[in-house]
């Protein structure tokens, strides 16, 4: 076998490589320009090689174990490469081999090492603008709920005086708009009370379980009946022979809103539904205002059986009292009682719940009667055969 020039060069390089591996190294500290690897997030580290003959040593060291060194100088001045201080760079080369005279014939390439990203912190930190937006939405929602009881009583009354009998009798949409505000207000408030009561209370004993499930079922029933009443009372025909003697518009626009809205307002604002602290919480002059609101809402029963046209007096008085109550809370809020479990405070809460249960029981009975008549008429109309025209 003949040896050519390539075989001679290969044997020459192999000989010097074996000499570098066998020879023991002499340890020394790395300089700033030594090749290094920096492990850190989103940073680049550059490996450099030294070819300066001033740093060459006569011995031929071998690969040594990695040892700490300082970050390398930035070989690219136009690019800002930052090396974090919390990561320690290590030398990944044999300094003696690079500084040896035999390495001068080799041409080294700068390698850029990209380390893997570190483990990210998954802790959720809410953004400031989202928190401020959520607070602003809660503030607007609270303002809407504050003025909702007055609007829920005044709007149906205004509709009663603006439109005539034929308008209510002929327009299904007008009846729906008249009933929407008072019953949607009661449905939303009872749904909120039901959600708060269900999520924040966990019954432990038998009596607490009975109270928990009774009140839970009662609030849920009030919500469902309010939604059902919007549908049923809209389908009802508000008609009569004479507008002065017609009772339907007054019942739907005065009596029922004056019943439902004040009681819903008192339960949501003046009462506390917390196990161990259930009761009436208002103090000072607000106690008198709340009692007057309760009397006005129940006072509709007297003219309802005698002279239905006089029911709007109680509706006007209830609206004025609720407005006074809201103005007092806005300009001079009163303190809530820290001990709402006093007997008279619990008695007021029970009285409000009893009145509300009776009113919503009546509304459920009327709604079922209206819906049954409506669907009976539909069934009768479908079952009636259509006569064919004579030939």
Swiss-Prot record:
Family: Belongs to the UPF0328 family.
Species: Encephalitozoon cuniculi (strain GB-M1)
Protein name (Swiss-Prot/TrEMBL): UPF0328 protein ECU06_1650
InterPro entries attached to this UniProt entry: UPF0328
